[in-house]
Curated annotation (Swiss-Prot):
Belongs to the V-ATPase E subunit family. Produces ATP from ADP in the presence of a proton gradient across the membrane. GO terms for biological process: proton motive force-driven plasma membrane ATP synthesis. One of its GO terms (cellular component) is proton-transporting two-sector ATPase complex, catalytic domain. Keywords: ATP synthesis, Hydrogen ion transport, Ion transport, Transport. It comes from the Bacteria. It comes from Borreliella afzelii (strain PKo) (Borrelia afzelii). GO terms for molecular function: ATP binding; proton-transporting ATP synthase activity, rotational mechanism; proton-transporting ATPase activity, rotational mechanism. The lineage of its organism: Bacteria, Pseudomonadati, Spirochaetota, Spirochaetia, Spirochaetales. The keyword Ion transport applies. This is V-type ATP synthase subunit E.
Amino acid sequence: MQFEVKDLINKIKKDGLEEAERVSNDIILKAKREAEEIVARAEESARALKAKSEKEINDYKSHALEASRQAIRDLIIGVEKNLKSLFENTLKDNVVEVFSDNNFLAELIIKITDSWAKEEKLVVQLNESDFSSLEQILRLKLGNKLAQGIEIKPFKGISKGFKIQKKNIGLQYDFSAETVADILFDYLNPRFKEIIKVV
């Protein structure tokens, strides 16, 4: 009986140990599975976070590059406008300077009036401030033509230059510094744009 009790105790111990080992193995296996799931979720989260970060970085780079391109375009357009304005102002200043020479203006007026039909009645309108000196030069150079139908008058609306009006048909030709500069600018502007064109 002693053996039976001993065997029974040994069997209980053995069964208890086996059960404890089985429970222990189940706990370890469950812990390993949970750990693997946690690692897998963490790796997936890390991959998603990395992909999101890379997309955000690429989007930021793309936006920054586009903003840089736009800023460069705006800068170029601004420089072109400033150069165009500088060119236009310089052209106008040069025309005003040339038109400030009364001898040049007198020669120009004479050449223009000589080229038109002799029967036409012309009115030459001059800037008020230059009128007296220009009138003297024109009277000397035109002589008889003044009596034959060319009339010289002062005109307030001209800063530099002159206007010629054909009396019998009512046409007026504007040779003021502003108009000549505008015509020259319109003529030269396409060429100027080609010179300064960057993009």
